[in-house]
A protein has these predicted regions:
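S-adenosyl-L-methionine-dependent methyltransferase catalytic core, i.e., the SAM/SAH-binding region
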Residues: 1-330
Length: 330
């Protein structure tokens, strides 16, 4: 999630200083901004050291079109790549790159998407019930398809699983009752349905928040994409290369935490209460660095959306990637 646009042209992503410190950019190195968005990480990496090269990946064509001036400014050093970061290995190998020195991920939905009602991500402004990261992909289901077509039990499962919503069954029941009268097409319609059946929390969080999060994650397969992206990073990073991942809610962070715990050899040990199937020991492919970091109070004051951000970082060892072995064995 990137910071909202301001009156200045510079696009500043969440925890920029901390991400740069984790990646430790060096002259002549190759980096990947895996969630390019407004290009904040990419720009900072290009400015941080001479002769750095950055590949900016984004599945949203609109983001890459908007980045044309930045690409001209850093001609020969910034390469824009259209696609999903879960496909990073193929995308970069296709561009002639087989190893990189650092990869940054800024997970979740970008402020550019949230602030545009026509993209259908926000419950604060009415718009089409879309939520696709790539609005040009006609093969991908929209949020409207999910709320109008999923059986009630499956819809409740999605809202509970991806929104961590305790009242998922009640919400699904209300949605099914509403769609029986007329198909749901607008974010405003859905938000009002949820608000009618979910009490407002004491902390002031909108009752529709968790349902919208759940549908967005479901529509874009965000958790699966994160798993694929981290596995791709393991394959692409050179020994000593750095990985920096900023997540914004517990589901994202759990995927990142689990991956790094496994790959660094810090997974929970088996016990008689929680046995873990025996498997051949593997050499750790990452070394954790810096511990978990959170935004400073100063950053939160200027950008409240940064508050839930969590940064996890790791350094690649010289061990063969587990992901590559798994892919060959499949």
């Amino acid at each position: 999630m990137t910071a909202p646009r301001s009156s200045t042209p510079r696009h500043v992503p969440v925890m920029l200083a901390e991400v740069l410190a984790a990646l430790a950019p060096k002259a002549g190195a190759i980096y990947v901004d895996a969630t390019f968005g407004g290009g904040g990480y990419a720009t900072a990496l290009l400015e941080a050291a001479p002769r750095t090269a950055v590949f900016g990946i984004d599945r949203d064509p609109e983001a890459l079109v908007a980045a044309a001036p930045l690409a001209r400014r850093f001609a020969g050093r910034l390469t824009l790549v259209a696609g999903r970061f879960g496909d990073m290995v193929g995308l970069l190998v296709g561009a002639g790159v087989r190893g990189v020195d650092g990869i940054a991920f800024d997970l979740g939905v970008s402020s550019m998407h949230l602030d545009d009602p026509e993209r259908g991500f926000s419950f604060r402004a009415d718009g089409p019930l879309d939520m696709r990261m790539d609005a040009t992909d006609s093969t991908q289901a929209r949020a409207a398809d999910a709320v109008n077509r999923l059986p009630e039990a499956e819809l409740a499962r999605v809202i509970r699983r991806f929104g961590e919503e305790k009242l998922a069954a009640r919400i699904a029941r209300a949605i099914v009752a509403a769609r029986a009268r007329a198909p749901l097409k607008r974010t405003g319609e859905l938000a009002e349905i949820v608000r009618r059946v979910v009490p407002r929390a004491r902390d002031g969080i909108d009752p529709a928040t968790r349902t919208f999060q759940a549908l967005r994650i479901y529509v874009n397969d965000e958790l699966g994409e994160i798993e694929r992206g981290l596995a791709a990073a393991e394959i692409l990073l050179k020994a000593g290369g750095r990985l920096a991942v900023v997540s914004f809610h517990s589901l994202e962070d759990r995927v990142v935490k689990t991956f790094l715990a496994e790959r660094s050899g810090r997974s929970p040990l088996p016990s008689r209460h929680r046995p873990i199937p025996q498997a051949p020991a593997r050499t750790p492919t990452f070394r954790l660095i810096a511990g978990i970091r959170r935004p400073s109070e100063a950053e939160i004051a200027t950008n409240p959306r940064a508050r839930p951000g969590r940064l996890r970082a790791a350094e690649r060892t010289d061990a063969p990637p587990w992901s590559d072995a798994e892919r060959r064995a499949a």
